[in-house]
Regions:
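Juxtamembrane/disordered regions of integral membrane proteins
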Residues: 1-138
Length: 138
């Protein structure tokens, strides 16, 4: 099992990385989408901070709690990241649709709101990788 200091280190790193991703989105969103209100930008910042926390916590589990199979960092981080952003896409489909059309255009290849699921997979795997490497115990 993981010690308390490694656990807290993992949480701090996960939340920090999530906050950094959210901050990036907070400042880049107005560059790509004109007249975007402050609420979705703040929501994005809070979402990815929570996202980093959840990915960091799930990285503490070596085995699936119910099914019992091994869960390496790349599996838990990518699956949890994709799942979290799938929930985001389902809840805010209309808002994401308008945003994605604003970024990629009406006929753009990546205009579907469900591309945020792939984004979540990549960001989740990245956060899981960094938190796993940084919280290893000697």
């Amino acid at each position: 099992m993981i010690s308390e200091s490694a656990f807290m280190k993992r949480i701090v790193i996960g939340k920090s990385l999530g906050f950094a991703v959210g901050l990036l989105g907070f400042f880049l969103l107005p560059v790509f989408v004109e007249h975007i209100p402050m609420m979705p930008r703040l929501g994005l910042l809070c979402w990815y901070t929570t996202f980093g926390f959840v990915v960091a916590i799930t990285g503490c589990l070596d085995r699936h709690p119910v099914l019992g199979f091994a869960m390496p960092w790349w599996l838990s981080g990518s699956v949890m990241g994709a799942w979290l952003n799938l929930v985001l896409a389902l809840m805010f489909y209309d808002t994401l649709d308008v945003t994605m059309v604003g970024i990629f255009g009406e006929d753009g290849l990546l205009r579907s709101p469900f591309w945020v699921v792939v984004e979540g997979l990549i960001i989740g795997a990245t956060i899981a990788f960094v938190t796993d490497r940084a919280s290893k115990e000697a």
